[in-house]
A protein has these predicted regions:
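Acidic, metal-coordinating helix/loop segments flanking the phosphotransfer/catalytic sites
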Residues: 4-5, 26, 40-64
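C-terminal output helix
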Residues: 46, 122-134, 142-147
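Active-site residues of response regulator receiver
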Residues: 68, 98
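Hydrophobic residue at a beta-alpha junction
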Residues: 71-74, 83, 92
Length: 149
């Protein structure tokens, strides 16, 4: 969480290569109730670079990561593995938000300690609703641990 103009902002990292989904996610979050800063990484390599900067105080620590699985350069499973194996990052909630409906993907990501697995709806209003529900759940229902920095 960061502060700007005396207000607390939630830091969200969206790891998504589909620009249409990036735009829809931005719109859904903008229409939500939570003040936020959205950081976008368009591939797994960019996500890992952002998280490297977080470790060294050069980028804000995300309060939530929305992670696609099918990413160029470094796939989402590899990104998830790096996050959850890093003591400094492991407590950040990771929501896998992907087009996959495969039971194998669901099982594997939970075994890798993803906090949620959500299949992206193809319908625009449903997609918007899913993003708003993610926001509501993670920032109004759930109590997250405090972190330093």
């Amino acid at each position: 969480m960061s502060e700007r103009n005396g207000m607390n902002y939630i830091e969200i990292l969206l790891v998504e290569d589909n620009q249409g989904d990036v735009v829809l996610t931005k719109r859904a979050l903008k229409s939500g109730k939570v003040l936020h800063n959205l950081h976008v990484a368009n591939d797994g390599e960019a996500a890992l670079a952002f998280l490297h900067d977080v470790e060294y105080g050069q980028a804000p620590r995300p309060d939530l990561i929305l992670l696609d699985l099918n990413l160029p350069k470094v796939n989402g499973r590899e990104v998830l593995a790096k996050i959850k194996s890093n003591e400094a990052l492991a407590s950040i909630p990771v929501v896998v938000l992907t087009t996959s409906k495969a039971d194998e993907d669901i099982l594997k990501t939970y075994q890798m300690h993803a906090n949620s697995f959500i299949t992206k709806p193809v319908d625009w209003p449903q997609f918007m609703n899913v993003v708003r529900l993610i926001e509501e759940y993670w920032f109004t229902v759930v109590k997250l641990p405090l972190h330093e920095g």
